[in-house]
Swiss-Prot record:
Residues annotated for NAD(+) binding in this entry: G8, C9, S10, G11, K12, M13, C85, T86, T87, S109, A110, N111, M112
Catalysed reactions listed for this entry: (S)-2,3,4,5-tetrahydrodipicolinate + NAD(+) + H2O = (2S,4S)-4-hydroxy-2,3,4,5-tetrahydrodipicolinate + NADH + H(+); (S)-2,3,4,5-tetrahydrodipicolinate + NADP(+) + H2O = (2S,4S)-4-hydroxy-2,3,4,5-tetrahydrodipicolinate + NADPH + H(+)
GO biological process, alphabetically ordered: diaminopimelate biosynthetic process; lysine biosynthetic process via diaminopimelate
Source organism of the structure: Clostridium novyi (strain NT)
Summary of the function given for this chain in its UniProt record: Catalyzes the conversion of 4-hydroxy-tetrahydrodipicolinate (HTPA) to tetrahydrodipicolinate.
Location of the protein in the cell: Cytoplasm
Lineage, broadest ranks: Bacteria, Bacillati, Bacillota, Clostridia, Eubacteriales
Gene this protein is translated from: dapB
Record-listed E.C. numbers: 1.17.1.8
Top enzyme category: oxidoreductase
GO molecular function, one term: 4-hydroxy-tetrahydrodipicolinate reductase
InterPro entries per record: DapB_C, DapB_N, DapB_N_CS, DHDPR_bac, NAD(P)-bd_dom_sf
Protein name according to UniProt: 4-hydroxy-tetrahydrodipicolinate reductase
Main location: cytoplasm
Active-site residue list: H142, K146
């Protein structure tokens, strides 16, 4: 049985993970980390991970970027793999994740959905081929409580496109004003409203036709299931930086 410490256990995603873990025979949540103690959860909850004295095999985080330092330190001190599902990290924090992956097993993905990661792989294959004759725009939609924009997933998709194209490209985040669209732009637009779980659309707009890749999450369960699959995968892994691609490939 792989024992999981869940950081952010009292949030919406934390609660969904606590429900979804019942679908995994080989996983159990043995402790939670959150400043809000939800009495409905059936495991001990600590306000800070430094207080946690429960034996575990993996740390799973769905909290906030400012928890990163304590999570990485705990993972290092206890020699535990850490699964980072939080978005909104700064460049400095992303660099720290890379640095720590040399001494502990670290999983990091901007989106835990299998579908999004398959679209990301498709973009690696088609972006360079389409760039010359198509304008590229990304639209992402989320609920009105999401604090980071553009979403980590939109940036993931955008960076995949940028990395696939030999020419220098730039992000135009939220086009505004009176200005002609430049050829080397990749537009990224964020919409916030209601209870939208998550929707991402990549548009290749050419002369006379439009190619669209779109993913819609209908429930947070899709992210919870992906995160728990990542926990299964990371148990016992060697030091290194892992992504959802590694999880997908392991199932083939």
């Amino acid at each position: 049985m792989t024992k999981v410490i869940l950081s952010g256990c009292s949030g919406k995603m934390g609660k969904m993970i606590s429900q979804s873990v019942n679908n995994f025979e080989g996983l159990s949540i043995v402790a939670g980390i959150d400043k809000f103690k939800d009495e409905s959860l059936k495991y001990p909850i600590f306000e800070n991970i430094t207080e946690c004295d429960v034996n575990a095999d993996v740390v799973l985080d769905f909290s906030r970027p400012d928890a990163l330092d304590s999570l990485l330190s705990y993972s290092k001190d206890n020699n535990l793999p850490v699964v980072l599902c939080t978005t909104g990290y700064s460049k400095e924090q992303l660099d720290k994740i890379d640095e720590y992956s040399k001494i502990v097993p670290v999983f990091h993905s901007a989106n835990m959905s299998i579908g999004i990661n398959l679209i990301n792989n498709i973009l690696k294959d088609i972006s360079a081929m389409l760039y010359e004759n198509y304008d590229i725009e990304i639209i992402e939609k989320h609920h009105n409580q999401k604090v980071d924009a553009p979403s980590g997933t939109a940036l993931l998709l955008g960076n995949t496109i940028k990395d696939s194209i030999k020419e220098d490209t730039v992000f135009n985040k939220g086009r505004n004003g009176i200005k002609k669209r430049e050829k080397n732009e990749i537009g990224i637009h964020a919409i916030r409203g209601g209870s939208i779980v998550g929707e991402h659309e990549v548009i290749f707009a050419g002369a006379g036709e439009i190619i669209e890749l779109k993913h819609t999450a209908l429930s947070r369960e899709v992210f919870a299931m992906g995160a728990l699959k990542a926990c299964e995968y990371m148990a016992g892994k060697n030091n290194g930086l892992y992504t959802m691609d590694d999880v997908i490939k392991s199932k083939n």
